[in-house]
């Protein structure tokens, strides 16, 4: 995972929730809760923030 210091974005696209870690690295999830949990775990480990876009 990139450690760019940029926030990790969580957003909905069509029926999926996506986590954008930066530098073109994304991850698909079927629920907002799953996406936020994945983003939070990486953010905590790397000292980054999470931005959820409605």
Identify the role of each PLM range.
Residues 1-14, 44-53:
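Short N-terminal "domain-start" leader segments
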Residues 7-8, 20-22:
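Ser/Thr-rich low-complexity repeats and stalk/linker segments
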Residues 21-34:
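A short, exposed loop/beta-hairpin motif centered on an aromatic-Gly-Thr core
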């Amino acid at each position: 995972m990139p450690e760019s210091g940029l926030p990790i974005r969580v957003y909905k696209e069509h029926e999926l929730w996506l986590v954008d870690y930066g530098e073109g690295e994304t991850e698909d999830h079927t629920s907002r809760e799953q996406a936020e949990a994945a983003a939070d775990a990486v953010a905590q480990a790397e000292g980054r923030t999470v931005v959820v876009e409605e």
